[in-house]
Each structure stands twice: as C-alpha cells, then as structure tokens.
From Swiss-Prot:
InterPro entries found in the cross-reference section: Luciferase-like_dom, Luciferase-like_sf, Pyrimidine_monooxygenase_RutA, SsuD_RutA_monooxygenase
Keyword Secreted recorded: no
Enzymatic reactions: uracil + FMNH2 + NADH + O2 = (Z)-3-ureidoacrylate + FMN + NAD(+) + H2O + H(+); thymine + FMNH2 + NADH + O2 = (Z)-2-methylureidoacrylate + FMN + NAD(+) + H2O + H(+)
GO biological process assignments: alkanesulfonate catabolic process; nitrogen utilization; uracil catabolic process
Gene Ontology molecular function: any one: alkanesulfonate monooxygenase activity
The protein's name: Pyrimidine monooxygenase RutA
Source lineage: Bacteria, Pseudomonadati, Pseudomonadota, Gammaproteobacteria, Pseudomonadales
Record EC number: 1.14.99.46
C-alpha cells in the first residue's frame, strides 16, 4: 500500500482546535516534513489549495501558501517522492495549468501530478469576482470534464483544438510536454464525481470515516469499482486519515480528547454553514461539515499505540480498490518521524520498505 502525506499548506494543519499545535505554514516547515517523509519511503506528498479560511479564534486556514509554487520549490529539494499540487480550476485556465505542470515535471524529473478541485466554498471565489453563480454546484463536473480533457490533450500531443461549453481552444500549444505520464487526482464522491474520476482521474481521493473504524470507507471504494466498470479503467482509491499515536492506547486517546476539548466552535460553525450551501455535494463535503467530529473536519481518525495504528492501517490496505492512504498528524514533524520509526516497521503492507532499506 502506498503512503502519502497531506502537507500543512494552511495554518494549524487539519485541527480546528486551540489545544492543537498553533503554527503558520512556511516553505521551510513543509520542506522539513516532505524531506523527512521521503527519507522514510513515503510514496507521495499532496498540497491542497485554500483561498479563504474559516475564521474563529484560531483563524483556521486564514493563512495559506499557494500549491503550485510550493510544490515547485519542494520538487527542487527532493529526489524520489511523487508530488501533487492542487489547482482551483475556477482560477487558472487549463492551458496555463498544463504549462505550469510541465514546468514542475521538468524540475522534479517526472515526479509531478495534479489534484483537480471544482470549488465548493463560495467566499473563496466571490472575493475576487470568480464565482460563476450557484448553478455551478450542479454543472461543476461538466466544467471539470472539459478542463481535464484540455489538460490531457495538451500533455499528450502538445496542442488542443478542443471546443466545449466552457472552454474553446484554437491551436493552443504547450511545449515542452511532460516527460512522465502526468497523473490526475480528483475527490469526487457524488454520483457525478465518481463518474468523472472513473473517466478522467488516475486516483480518487476520499475521506476515511469515524474514529478507529479503518474499513468504514469500503462502500465508497466499492462505488468507484462499479464506476470503473462503466469506463473500463482502473482508477483506485486513496484514503485520508489523521494519525494520533503514542506509546499506549490510553496516552493517544487522552491527546485526542484534549484536542477535541479545545474545538474552535466559531470556525466549525462557519464550515457547517458554507458546506451546507452545496445541495448537490458528495459525501466528502457533507462529512466535513458534520458537527460530530468537525475538530479535524471529520476525516477518518486512527487513535492508539504504534502497534494499534499499524494494525488499523493494514486493515485499510485490505479494502478492495485501495491504492494507498494519505496521512495527516496533529504534530507533523514528530508525526512523520514517529510513523517512520515506530509504526511503518510494524505494518505488513509496508514490508517492502524495510526490505528495500536492508538492500540499501
């Protein structure tokens, strides 16, 4: 099973709590995290894009780096790990995104790919006059399909004459083209989102579910398998989990409870309000806005000792259609080190990393 890191491009990572580590996103922080992850054999690193935060006393996600430029910098200081930037497709034309990706492909020597997002948080786009209207909630995957087709055309042939409802290319060109096969990620969970991923993506990003229920996402992975049957492609799932690990189950649980006790209710309420605006939202967005465990945006959470977390991650790997997991931590620097030293060596699904290190 592949292991990735969802790097903290926004302040405070993925914890909406005053009891969690409070920090600003910087290039140096993310460089340290990704270089450490690369040293422990992580397969990929992905950065999101966020253009406006949730407010509250923690100013959650009010401070964010930009995804493509961050990953370009990280491409220059890494050598093996695959890197994915996220493009907010309402903000950057596909031909420009294709050229940016080709540039980072050159910097990284073929280790770059793109995560495509349509945009669900209206204030991110309204603030710069780019929100197309609420009807976009219903047509966004049609828009994204055209966007992805233009990308594929330009990367495959260097030119595009695509004509659609949203984009019109006229002998549009990109050169040099990427040397590697450019991979696309999408996070579609609605019926339209799954259909898009099965047609255009290489991996589909989904949320884990619940606390210490590592296989609860299995129905989502199964829906993707069924969508693949209609397209004849083999798009696999990549599942997001937060790791809260310690020497004992009790110590890890105490830390998790302390984080929840400091929940920034104002920021969480803002998330719930904006998340409910998209009536056509898939399960990911509805899950994010659910107040049940919104302190970490309701991503799947694995809490326990090193051995407990290793066992649960191996359970994740057993779900059909699962390519890998993408991890977040309460403390990213320590979390990556603890994973590499104390959790990964106990994982059956990562035995190949230990064997590789023995050979080296």
């Amino acid at each position: 099973m592949d292991i990735g890191i969802f790097i903290p491009i926004g302040n405070n990572g993925w914890l909406i709590s005053s009891n969690a580590p409070q920090y600003m996103p910087t290039f140096e922080l993310n460089k340290q995290i990704v270089q450490t992850a690369e040293g422990y054999g992580f397969d990929f690193a992905l950065s999101m894009i966020k253009l406006r935060g949730f407010g509250g006393k923690t100013e959650f996600w009010e401070h964010n780096l930009e995804s493509f430029t961050l990953m370009a910098g990280l491409a220059a200081v890494t050598s093996k790990i695959q890197l994915f930037a996220t493009v907010a497709t309402l903000t950057i034309p596909p031909a420009i995104a294709a050229r940016m990706a080709s540039t980072i492909d050159s910097i990284s020597n073929g280790r770059f790919g793109i995560n495509l997002v349509t945009g669900w948080q209206k204030p991110e786009y309204e603030q710069m006059g780019l929100w197309p209207g609420d009807e976009f909630f219903h047509t966004r995957y049609e828009y994204l399909a055209e966007y992805a087709q233009v990308l594929r055309d330009l990367w495959a042939t260097g030119s595009s004459d695509f004509k659609g409802e949203h984009f019109s290319m006229q002998d549009c060109r990109v050169s040099p083209r990427p040397k590697a096969d450019m991979k696309l990620i999408c996070a579609g969970q609605s019926e339209a989102g799954m259909a898009f991923s099965a047609q255009y993506a290489d991996y589909n990003f989904c949320f884990g579910k619940g606390v210490n229920t590592p296989t609860a996402f299995a129905p989502t992975a199964q829906k993707l398998i069924e969508a693949n049957e209609k397209t004849g492609r083999n798009v696999t799932s990549c599942v997001l989990f937060m790791i809260i690990a310690d020497d004992t189950d009790e110590a890890a649980r105490a830390r998790w409870e302390h984080i929840k006790d400091g929940a920034d209710e104002e920021a969480i309420a803002w998330l719930s309000e904006k998340g409910s605006a998209d009536k056509s939202a898939g399960s990911n967005l509805r899950q994010m806005a659910d107040p049940t465990s919104a302190v970490n945006i309701n991503m799947g959470t694995l809490v326990g000792s090193w051995a407990t977390v290793a066992r649960m991650l191996d359970e994740v790997a057993s779900v059909p259609g699962t390519q890998g997991v993408m991890l977040t931590f309460d403390d990213f620097v320590k979390g990556v080190e603890d994973f590499g030293e104390k959790i990964q060596p106990l994982m059956t699904s990562r035995k190949h990393i230990a064997q590789l290190k023995e050979v080296v």
